[in-house]
Amino acid sequence: MTSQESIGIKFLFGGLSCMGAAVVSNPVDVLKTRFQIHGEGIDSKSLGLVNGTIKIIKNEGISAMYKGLTPSLLREATYSTLRMGGYDVIKNYFIDSNGKTNLLSKVTSGALSGALGACITSPTDLIKVRMQASSKGVKYDSISSAFKEIIAKEGIKGLWKGVGPTTQRAALLTASQIPSYDHIKHMILDHGIIQVDGLQVHIVSSIFAGLIASITTSPVDLVKTRIMNQPFDSNGVGLIYKSSYDCFKKTFQSEGISGLYKGFLPNWFRIGPHTIVTFILYEYLRKVSGIKPI
């Protein structure tokens, strides 16, 4: 396999791994989205993980837990293909004479690949969020109708509403998730805590990576969700928030610091399993294809 083929395969495997993880984590992603928009501008009690799930299933049916799955898969096929594959490509530029890459270089590689992927594919995330946020039926009949309706009502630029916080979140997520997995895994192996680069070390490393990513991204993820889901006037201007900073400030003022972490548990419960499944699949696909592990 040539180096060019190897790079292409890494991009492909990155997207496929994240698509598999999206199927597993979509129900929690729906719950997380509902948590984040719950109580905007009003005083409200927390839905609660169990109560929230029961309420959604009771009112909308169990299929509601898979709202937004199609755009989610499309997003993973585009965004995650770019961020997962791009991480290795960018990281290679930072390899030292000993064949090693330091943590800062890994974080930089993650931030750049995540930001690039999110900026290009932001429309798919916008559609996913709006579908998952709707409790009165899906806002759009299909992905194609969603694209057409958004363009008709909000213009082409409407597809990139929330691109700022989306890109910020993606940069933070990829900068914390992939590098932490990469670094923790090699620390465990180098110190002999686990001696074989196999399933056990992949699970342990991805659990820590998922927790770190959840803590890092929860506030900006909430801001992204609220901006994307808010109503807009005829000129495409948000009726609740003017910018990411405005959303951050209003949320903090009305709901406190805990408001910025609204939906943290479902976010963690989503990112955790998503991260575990992603890296198990990604490492397995690389192994059977003869590509060096992360």
Swiss-Prot record:
Solcar repeats lie at residues 9-93, 101-187, 197-288. Keywords: Membrane, Mitochondrion, Mitochondrion inner membrane, Repeat, Transmembrane, Transmembrane helix, Transport. Its main location: mitochondrion. One of its GO terms (cellular component) is mitochondrial inner membrane. It is found in: Mitochondrion inner membrane. Residues 1-10, 89-106, 183-192, 286-294 are mitochondrial intermembrane. Residues 32-67, 128-161, 214-267 are mitochondrial matrix. It is a multi-pass membrane protein. It comes from the Eukaryota. The chain crosses the membrane at residues 11-31, 68-88, 107-127, 162-182, 193-213, 268-285. GO terms for molecular function: transmembrane transporter activity. Mitochondrial solute carriers shuttle metabolites, nucleotides, and cofactors through the mitochondrial inner membrane. PANTHER family: MITOCHONDRIAL DICARBOXYLATE CARRIER-RELATED. Belongs to the mitochondrial carrier (TC 2.A.29) family. This is Mitochondrial substrate carrier family protein ucpB. The gene is ucpB.
